[in-house]
Amino acid sequence: MAKTIMIQGTMSNAGKSLLAAGLCRVLKQDGYRVAPFKSQNMALNSFITKDGGEMGRAQVVQAEAAGIEPDVRMNPILLKPTTDVGSQVIVNGRVQGNMPAMEYYRRKRDFIPAVMEAYESLAREYDIIVIEGAGSPAEINLQENDIVNMGLARMVDAPVLLVGDIDRGGVFAQLYGTVALQSEEDRRRIKGVVVNKFRGDRAILEPGLKTLEELCGVPVAGVVPYLHVDIDDEDSLSERFGRDKEPRLIDIAVIRLPRISNFTDFSPFERYENVSLRYVERARDLRAPDMIVIPGTKSTIADLQWLRQSGLEASIQKAASGGTLVFGVCGGYQMLGWHISDPKQVEAAGVTEIDGMGLLPLETVFQGEKVQTQTNGVFSGVAGLLSELNGKRYAGYEIHMGRSEEARGALFSMGNVYGSYVHGIFDEQEVADTILKALCTKKGVSFESLGTFDAKAYKERQYDLLADAVRAGLDMPLIYRILNQEV
């Protein structure tokens, strides 16, 4: 069976996901077969594996860092919020249905067999399992039925690294308080604490680190700097949305829907030096972009209502009539059509039908069975501004409940309005390049002035930079002693 180490945090967004990815990369570099694991993830950012299973993207990133194929066993339970008090529950990659939060909480321990089967299966195939917790083990109201933090650590007998975020302040209180709120048994599982997202001279921290070790009775296993790496990370969501880049040669506006999903679809465009990718949630902030993207969403009808009430729908329609390129992905694609109906209330109780934006000739009906599959092929029949996509390869995955009439192929278009069910459709560098070339031609600027790069080599380099920072920040001899159960 594999050795294991678990990374827990003092709070959400403490940097667990990225630290786990970095540790996966370090251990891979050191010659180990490594797999990530997170028993339960709550996220709208998901991925479809080769066998059609759905899992959280955080574990996909960690698998990529480890150099292995993503597998639903790495994230056996995925919760995708549908409302403020309920989620779609996905177990072993397959939808089990929608469930109110309290019902899931009551039934949570029923999912332990699925969690353990997934973990034990991975543990038979790999040398080391790097486990990520969720939220904080200090949520004492959730400890009784916990299956993702200390509850999971007990089930798989995992030693724990506790991570605190110094960038938001109060890291010593975070770490000490979290340790103090654990039972004696669980405190013994904490083998090291980590100060994460540090900026500055470590020498300034040293007195506090020594006091922290004395108070907690646990060694400081590292001080990891604030990482400036370009890796898709769930913890960077609020930071990503908060960006408002200064003007660049090409301006792309992504509509920030309330229930936006798979925001990483647009990451390829962020990597061009002279492309501005903005997230917009107010009509007055839309301005006059070169391209408007309506992203995927977990609640198409509710987010279309929001789009309408906010005034953004009218602004997008006006921009489209003026020739601006408009592109919808998945739920955003459905919104662009004539009509959406949900007769069985698959999304949520409430509205069963709604008129779409009327920019594409398609009608969508939500059905009980979810489409979740990887897909690839060659573009054909693409007209208008993006006609140069014809003959070029695409790859990605589909995750949606609705079926749309008149939607054929990977890309459906009418004039300057385009839509696709394929998440990751921009990931192939040739696809992103072709779209940007078309925008440059329309605007009369040089594509070469945007700055180009090798996307695959760039991604691998980012994982190596992450590993360099994690290796330098962590006490790796201590990490290996923890893995070998020597502390």
Predicted regions span which residues?
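A conserved active-site-flanking secondary-structure segment within enzyme catalytic domains
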Residues: 337-391
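Flexible phosphate-sensing "switch/lid" loops adjacent to ATP/NTP-binding sites
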Residues: 1-320, 325, 345, 368-369, ...
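Catalytic nucleophile serine of serine hydrolases
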Residues: 330
